[in-house]
């Protein structure tokens, strides 16, 4: 997250020209995912774009499967949130074998030397995940400037001071 923090504080373009952040961090691509969790989508007008993109891809949106973990504040996108920029962190979901794949990866490889390029990957799942994120990004690029939802905690904490 150090690199994301540096970039969010020292962007190569004016911060005001960054309208949203779409974070692709650690999707588990070892199974045919049928759902995703979009952390933060419900906090801003990014949410409807995510819903439309997922519907076009026939991918279900699932709620946070581990809300006590605070995942919305634990990835690169949060550094942009701290700068007042709406963000979404999309990851593969727990349906269709996803929970087992996630828990196995966490137990066996997460932050361990075995987390390397020798791990299996389903390239069809990778292509689907990339396409979904492209669809989300295209929606955001072609639509109105994203805005925080009125009364959102992170909007009140970070967006108003920018």
Model-predicted regions and their roles:
Residues 16-21, 48-52, 116-120, 138-139, ...:
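Short, surface-exposed, polar/charged, turn-prone segments marking secondary-structure boundaries
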Residues 91-160:
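His/Asp/Glu-rich mid-to-C-terminal helical/loop segments that flank catalytic regions of hydrolases
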């Amino acid at each position: 997250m150090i690199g994301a923090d540096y970039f969010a504080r020292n962007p190569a373009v004016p911060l005001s020209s960054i309208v949203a952040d779409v974070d692709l961090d650690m999707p588990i691509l070892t199974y045919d995912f049928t759902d995703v969790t979009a952390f933060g989508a419900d906090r801003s007008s990014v949410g409807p774009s995510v819903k439309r993109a997922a519907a076009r891809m026939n991918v279900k949106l699932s709620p946070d499967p581990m809300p006590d973990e605070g995942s919305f504040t634990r990835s690169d996108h949060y550094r942009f949130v701290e700068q007042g920029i709406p963000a979404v962190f999309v990851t593969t979901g727990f349906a269709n074998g996803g929970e087992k794949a996630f828990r196995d990866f966490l137990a066996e490889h997460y932050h361990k030397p075995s987390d390397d390029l020798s791990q299996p990957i389903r390239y069809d799942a990778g292509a689907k995940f990339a396409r979904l994120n492209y669809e989300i990004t295209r929606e955001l690029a072609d639509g109105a400037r994203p805005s925080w939802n009125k009364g959102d905690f992170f909007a009140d904490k970070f967006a108003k001071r920018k």
